[in-house]
Design a protein with these regions (language model features):
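Structural signature of the two symmetry-related core transmembrane helices
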Residues: 143-158
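Helix-to-loop junctions at the C-terminal end of transmembrane segments
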Residues: 19, 127-141
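Loop-to-transmembrane helix entry
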Residues: 29-36, 100, 106-124, 169, ...
Length: 293
């Protein structure tokens, strides 16, 4: 996960310059060639990964087919809480990443600065991922998610005010939010592993792959909803590309960088209050599940 966020830093800072270089003034061609370049690198890395991975399978009573696995997962209440959590995260909480270009282009009038802004945010997120290791050793994952999402909401809400106070203030608010997001992301993935263990404990059958796939689906579903929400809001409030925006649209853009994702963070914190798998409960489950060492 740490390396993936380092890649985010490089992509955030390098994409627009690469578009300009490859497109030679043609933005559409530049983006097409840039993402083709990224795709080629991704394909090569996947090949290297598959070549180097050796599966270590722990013998256990697995479900005989995916539908049976899905049936077991569907009866697990923690899964549905995590499913809703993931949708909130990928619909609202990651909205600042997609709204940043609009914020810099129309609200600040400094479109060229967005690459550095995002790169610094993701660099802060890398620091948060590293710090997460210290936090997870001392605190229950559920409590970390509650506290981190409350802090994330406060940091994002502060951006609404900081946006009008100058670069040091809005950059500090964004970097603080991204640092906290670096704590949230790996904690969420650790909880997905807990759900897989819970499903095995509850059903007596392993369904780890299907559990992870189902949660990953919620991520993609949330991303698609997030894109839809952004488009619908822009349409409702009268956004017109490449023109001077109305005051209403400018407030919407600033809210997409701050208030709306903050609401998502508070929603996640609320869901975590009813999430039943704390670290103490998971210790009991791992001792009792069929493949316990």
């Amino acid at each position: 996960m740490l390396l993936s966020y380092i890649a985010f830093v490089l992509i955030s800072y390098g994409t627009l310059p690469l578009v300009e270089f490859l497109g030679d003034g043609d933005e559409q061609r530049g983006f097409a060639l840039t993402y083709a370049f990224y795709g080629a690198i991704t394909f090569a890395v996947f090949l290297l990964t598959f070549k180097g991975v050796r599966e270590r399978y722990v013998e256990g009573d697995s479900a005989s087919n995916p539908l049976e696995s899905l049936a077991h997962i569907g009866r697990a209440r923690p899964f549905w809480i995590m499913f809703a959590t993931s949708i909130l995260i990928f619909t609202l909480m990651l909205m600042p990443d997609s709204a940043a270009i609009y914020f810099f282009k129309y609200y600040l009038g400094e479109a060229s600065s967005v690459s550095l802004f995002l790169a610094m945010g993701y660099a802060s997120m890398v620091a948060g991922v590293i710090f997460n290791q210290l936090v997870m050793r001392r605190f229950c994952k559920r409590r970390v998610m509650i506290g981190a999402n409350l802090a994330y909401g406060v940091a994002l809400a502060s951006f609404f005010v900081a946006a009008d106070q100058g670069p040091p203030f809005y950059l500090a608010a964004f970097m603080a939010a991204k640092f906290i997001n670096g704590i949230i992301a790996p904690t969420m993935w650790a909880m997905v592993g807990d759900i897989a263990d819970y499903v095995e404990y509850q059903s007596g059958r392993r369904a780890t792959g299907t559990t992870i796939s189902a949660v990953t689906f919620s991520h993609k579903f949330g991303m698609s909803i997030g894109g839809l929400v952004t488009g619908v809001l822009f349409s409702i409030y009268g956004y017109t590309p490449n023109t001077e925006q109305s005051e209403t649209v400018l407030v919407l853009i600033k809210s997409m960088m701050s208030v709306l994702p903050a609401v998502g963070a508070l929603g996640v914190a609320a869901l975590m209050l009813i999430y039943p798998l704390g670290d103490r409960r998971m210790a009991e489950i791992r001792t009792a599940k069929p493949t316990a060492a």
